[in-house]
């Protein structure tokens, strides 16, 4: 083998090693959506109130809890009580796979997430399409408690920039007490602010045609959630919230968040 061919082989082997063992930022990053990818508020003819209640002040929140049961291999059940409305005392959170459920099964965790009641099943005896009394369901929303909080009860501010028709119209901060926080928690807090300040969701519809919330991690990876319901006259809360089942977490100190909205007359 001549020298030039040997060098070429070495370069090729080195390149293969990089591909196999170096995290591929671009492959893991979700590109920004095109307009055609986003749901349109005008195409939804049901009540937007059913979306609004998912991001109001009645989310599930608990600290230092352990799972007490499960229904399926990829979910966990917790004894968590609704202290505001007294609607439930048990919460089932469903995860993407059995591996995630096993990861948190015997851990002391914090739970924070948007919940639903219709099509919430704790056993095979629950009636399809009915509300199960004293119980509620969610997806993801789990973080380990030990070592995941700031000293002295300090809170981390997370900046959120809002763009309406591509123009930065408002910026605000939400707070979390967690170092590693679920994207779901930050999403809930961001949308809650926008409901109160910008009427993001109204009873029948929304002043906005499209919307998505984008998370930018410290390594450059990005991902987003569509903020509008799918077309049609019915909104399936369980199906919509399923986007949180991967229990995606971000570093609260470094994550950047953008909300992109377009108005109906924009």
Swiss-Prot record:
Pfam families: Stap_Strp_tox_C (PF02876), Stap_Strp_toxin (PF01123). One of its GO terms (cellular component) is extracellular region. Its main location: secreted. Residues 1-27 form the signal peptide. This is Enterotoxin type C-1. It is found in: Secreted. Belongs to the staphylococcal/streptococcal toxin family. The keyword Lipid metabolism does not apply. Disulfide bonds join 120-137. PROSITE patterns: STAPH_STREP_TOXIN_1, STAPH_STREP_TOXIN_2. Staphylococcal enterotoxin that activates the host immune system by binding as unprocessed molecules to major histocompatibility (MHC) complex class II and T-cell receptor (TCR) molecules. In turn, this ternary complex activates a large number of T-lymphocytes initiating a systemic release of pro-inflammatory cytokines. Inhibits SEC1-mediated T-cell activation in the absence of MHC class II by competing with SEC1 for binding to the host TCR. Also causes the intoxication staphylococcal food poisoning syndrome. It comes from Staphylococcus aureus. Keywords: Disulfide bond, Enterotoxin, Secreted, Signal, Superantigen, Toxin, Virulence. Interacts with host MHC class II molecules composed of alpha/HLA-DRA and beta/HLA-DRB1 chains. One of its GO terms (molecular function) is toxin activity. Gene3D superfamilies: 2.40.50.110, 3.10.20.120.
């Amino acid at each position: 083998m001549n020298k030039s061919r040997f060098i070429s082989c070495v370069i090729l082997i080195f390149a293969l090693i990089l591909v196999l063992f170096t995290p591929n930022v671009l492959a893991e990053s979700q590109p920004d959506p095109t307009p055609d990818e986003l749901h349109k508020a005008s195409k939804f003819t049901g009540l937007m109130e059913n979306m609004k209640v998912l991001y109001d002040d009645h989310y599930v929140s608990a600290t230092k809890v352990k799972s007490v049961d499960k229904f399926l291999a990829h979910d966990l059940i917790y004894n968590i009580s609704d202290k505001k409305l007294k609607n439930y005392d048990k919460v089932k959170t469903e995860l993407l796979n059995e591996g995630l459920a096993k990861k948190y099964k015997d851990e002391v965790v914090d739970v924070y997430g948007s919940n639903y009641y219709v099509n919430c099943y704790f056993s095979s005896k629950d009636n399809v399409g009915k509300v199960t009394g004293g119980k509620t369901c969610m997806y993801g929303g789990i973080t380990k408690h030990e070592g995941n909080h700031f000293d002295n009860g300090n809170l981390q501010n997370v900046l959120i920039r809002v763009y309406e028709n591509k123009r930065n119209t408002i910026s605000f901060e939400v707070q979390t007490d967690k170092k590693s926080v679920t994207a779901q928690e930050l999403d809930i807090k961001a949308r809650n602010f926008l409901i109160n300040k910008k009427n993001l969701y109204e009873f029948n519809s929304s002043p906005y045609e499209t919307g998505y919330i984008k998370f930018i991690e410290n390594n450059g990876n990005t991902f987003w959630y569509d903020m509008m319901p799918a077309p049609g006259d019915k909104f399936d809360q369980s199906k919509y919230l399923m986007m949180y089942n991967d229990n995606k977490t971000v570093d609260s100190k470094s994550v950047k968040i953008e909300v992109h909205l377009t108005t109906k007359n924009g």
